Amino acid sequence: MPERRIDFVKPAGLYRDAPYAYASVAPAGGLVFSAGACPVGPDGIVVGPGDLTAQAETTISNLFEALEAAGASPGDVLKTTVYVVTSSQKDLVEVWAAVKSAFEPFDPPSTLLGVAVLGYTEQLVEIEAVALAPAPSEPAPSP
């Protein structure tokens, strides 16, 4: 069997019983693909039921933790997709304000859309990202 070239990341600080990895990392020079980050605490409970901003902020925090565990940072993000349970543009704008603020001074392209339902009961926000994978360490110069 060929050597596996993808690392699946499950950060210790996030809900550990999730049935999926929070991010995957390709070899150096590759990409990090996050799972959809959710507004779920380490206990597996949705944070801020009914509160779009609280859920967006928790989701972003979880996304950044997953990216960090994969060796990436907000400045490495190439694109995000933001899902919001709504049919209201006002709600989309509210969530977008939290996302834009969290990524400043970076401004990665994003898709923002309203959806009918997400995976957890009372979940209103989910965000996924694609980021640059960490570069390999430079070898020490020869003496």
Language-model regions: role of each:
Residues M1-S61, E65-A70, G75-L78, V85-P143:
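N-terminal presequence-like segments and the immediate start of the first folded domain
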